[in-house]
C-alpha cells in the first residue's frame, strides 16, 4: 500500500520529512535537510509533514499548514525553529503562535483565520493519518515514495538516514 501526502504525478518520487517544531533533533537536522532540498533531484518532490503525537502538538502542526496555505513556508519555517530553540520562546498554543507570527510579518487575525480554517484542519488530519500509516515513532523521520521509512534511530544519525533515503530513491527509480 502506498502512503502519499499528495499526488506527486507520473515519474516523480515523493520524499516526506516528518518533523515537530519543538524537537531539538528536528531543529539540528533542518539546515542539512534544507540544503539537501535545494539540491534535490528534479524527479523528487519534497513534502514536510508536521507530526502530532499528542494533542498539544496540534497548534504547531497547524502553524506549518498556515504558512503553507499563505505561501510563507520559506519565510517562516526556519524562523519558528529559531524562536523555539535559540530564543527559547514557548510557542505551543494558537494565541502564542499568532502573537509570534504577528511580530514576524503575518497579521495575527490572518494567522488565526487560516489556523481555524477547514483547509488547515483537513491538512492537519491528513498529516496525522500519514504519520500513523508510516508508523512514525520519533522525529525527524523520512518517508520515501509512500512505501519506505527511515529515521535517525534506525540509522544512528540523520546524516545516514538521508543517505538511506537517497539509496531508496535510487531503488524506486530502478523500479524496485
Language-model segment annotations:
Residues 103-176:
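C-terminal cap of thioredoxin/glutaredoxin-like
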Residues 39-101:
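Structural microenvironment flanking redox-active thiols in thiol-disulfide oxidoreductases
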Residues 30-37, 60-64, 77, 94, ...:
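Extracytoplasmic/secreted envelope proteins and their assembly/folding machinery
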Residues 19-22, 33, 37-40, 67-71, ...:
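Sec/Tat-exported extracytoplasmic proteins
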Residues 11-12, 16, 22-30, 53-60, ...:
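Solvent-exposed, acidic/flexible segments
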Residues 1-58, 128, 170-176:
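Extracytoplasmic thiol/disulfide redox context detector
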Amino acid at each position: 500500500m502506498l502512503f502519499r501526502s499528495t499526488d506527486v504525478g507520473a515519474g516523480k518520487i515523493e520524499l516526506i520529512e516528518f518533523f515537530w517544531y519543538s524537537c531539538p533533533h528536528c531543529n539540528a537536522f533542518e539546515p542539512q535537510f534544507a540544503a539537501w532540498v535545494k539540491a534535490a533531484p528534479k524527479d523528487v518532490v519534497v513534502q514536510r509533514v508536521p507530526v502530532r503525537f499528542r494533542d498539544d502538538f496540534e497548534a504547531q502542526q497547524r502553524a506549518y499548514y498556515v504558512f503553507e496555505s499563505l505561501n510563507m513556508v520559506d519565510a517562516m519555517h526556519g524562523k519558528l525553529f529559531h524562536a523555539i530553540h535559540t530564543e527559547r520562546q514557548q510557542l505551543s498554543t494558537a494565541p502564542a503562535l499568532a502573537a509570534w507570527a504577528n511580530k514576524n510579518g503575518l497579521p495575527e487575525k490572518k494567522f488565526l483565520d487560516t489556523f481555524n480554517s477547514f483547509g488547515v484542519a483537513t491538512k492537519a488530519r491528513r498529516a496525522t493519518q500519514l504519520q500513523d500509516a508510516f508508523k512514525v515513532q520519533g522525529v525527524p523521520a523520512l518517508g520515501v515514495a509512500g512505501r519506505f521509512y527511515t529515521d535517525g534511530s534506525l540509522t544512528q544519525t540523520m546524516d545516514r538516514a538521508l543517505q538511506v533515503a537517497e539509496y531508496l530513491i535510487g531503488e524506486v527509480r530502478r523500479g524496485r
